């Protein structure tokens, strides 16, 4: 069971390895639940994105609770547990990105008694040869940067090593895995990935962005998807639009495919070679020196609680986690390297430099 944006890719991968038996299905949660068959084993990729009963989501996610036998279920995970004799779940608490996703508490309750194993290494991230730091140093550093004040790092839900090598964030050499730009973020990030593409034509490089809006970044609408004349990011004379689709985005045939700016929904579960990430004003440093999400600067309404729900401090905290998780996904897409840019958010740059002890 995979995310919709990865279904076709997953089918092709399994076919390449000859795993296209009638006894094997590559599908999505809503499809497998609607078919309502029974399976010996169900493996769920990105189970942190399994849906729960919640109003703000695509209607198809809620319609499955009308199927006979599933009326009393409160999440897709509960339904899948009824359908499979054995359930294997790939879960990352740091990648739940909207209120309709299964909550941490629901997941813990439903998997009580399950055997739990941690993934200790991010194989998608490759530190350059000859460096003293590793991919784990980078991932643990990003976790510390985003979540140090959330108490998640000390929980049993995530794997975190506080003794990461900060050299990964202080490597100033041209082949450094990590780096960041100052000044005009979109210009510089595009220039960086295009320079790499000149030397490595086979590389799949993209600029990605948090889902923010401000005076120079327009709000996105689903109606904009196929109209290449509508752009959203404006930096001097340079204009770019959001990804035109979420499904199989990196393989689309649009004339401006490589120029589109990718959102978290287009790249979750996707590996890229080199990645530029723009961090915007939807995440700010508050008066207590902690990261806090700003609802008015975030464009996707399905990522937000209602106005009434946001009066609850617990939901305010959860919303901040959703935005932090979105940036965590973006910051862990690059195999060969990443550069950060800050769109109207120099406060975050300074916060990052101080938190990770980056020497200027």
Task: Give names to the regions the model predicted.
Residues 1-12:
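Conserved Walker A/P-loop ATP-binding site and its immediately adjacent core
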Residues 13-81, 259-263, 326:
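Conserved RecA-like ASCE ATPase "motif II neighborhood" in helicase/translocase motors
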Residues 39-42, 86-89, 96, 115-117, ...:
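Beta-sheet entry/capping signal
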Residues 43-126:
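Signature of the SF2 helicase/ATPase Hel1-core->accessory helical subdomain module
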Residues 58-75, 249-259, 298-321:
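Conserved RecA-like P-loop NTPase helicase motor core
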Residues 83-88, 260-360:
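C-terminal accessory regions
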Residues 100-113, 225-233, 343-360:
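C-terminal/domain-terminus segments
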Residues 100-103, 115-291:
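Conserved helicase/translocase motor-coupling segment
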């Amino acid at each position: 069971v995979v995310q919709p944006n990865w279904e076709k890719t997953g089918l092709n991968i399994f076919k390449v390895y000859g795993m296209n038996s009638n006894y094997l299905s590559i599908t999505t949660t809503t499809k497998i639940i609607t078919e309502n068959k029974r399976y010996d084993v169900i493996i769920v990729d990105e189970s942190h994105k399994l849906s729960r009963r919640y109003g703000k989501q695509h209607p198809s996610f809620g319609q499955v609770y009308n199927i006979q036998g599933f009326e009393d279920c409160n999440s897709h995970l509960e339904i899948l547990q009824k359908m499979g004799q054995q359930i294997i779940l790939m879960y990352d608490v740091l990648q739940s990105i909207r209120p309709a996703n299964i909550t941490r508490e629901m997941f813990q309750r439903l998997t009580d008694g399950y055997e739990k194993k941690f993934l200790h290494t991010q194989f998608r991230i490759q530190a350059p040869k000859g460096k003293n730091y590793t991919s784990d140093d980078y991932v643990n550093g990003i976790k510390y940067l985003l979540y140090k004040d959330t108490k998640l790092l000390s929980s049993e839900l995530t794997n975190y090593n506080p003794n990461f090598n900060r050299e990964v964030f202080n490597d100033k050499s041209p082949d450094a895995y990590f780096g960041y730009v100052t000044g005009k973020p979109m210009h510089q990030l595009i220039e960086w990935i295009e320079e790499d593409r000149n030397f490595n034509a086979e590389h799949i490089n993209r600029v990605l962005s948090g889902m923010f809006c401000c005076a120079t970044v327009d709000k996105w609408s689903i109606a904009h998807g196929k109209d290449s004349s509508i752009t959203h990011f404006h930096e001097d004379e340079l204009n770019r639009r959001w990804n035109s689709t979420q499904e199989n985005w990196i393989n689309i045939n649009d004339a401006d495919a490589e120029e589109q700016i990718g959102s978290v929904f287009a790249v979750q579960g996707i590996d890229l070679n080199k990645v530029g990430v723009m961090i915007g004003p939807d995440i700010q440093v508050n008066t207590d020196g902690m990261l806090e999400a700003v609802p008015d600067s975030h464009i996707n309404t399905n990522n937000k609680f209602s106005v009434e729900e946001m009066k609850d401090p617990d939901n305010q905290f959860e919303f901040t986690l959703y935005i932090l998780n979105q940036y965590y996904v973006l910051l862990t897409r690059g195999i060969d390297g990443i550069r950060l840019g800050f769109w109207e958010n120099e406060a975050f740059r300074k916060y990052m430099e101080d938190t990770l002890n980056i020497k200027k």
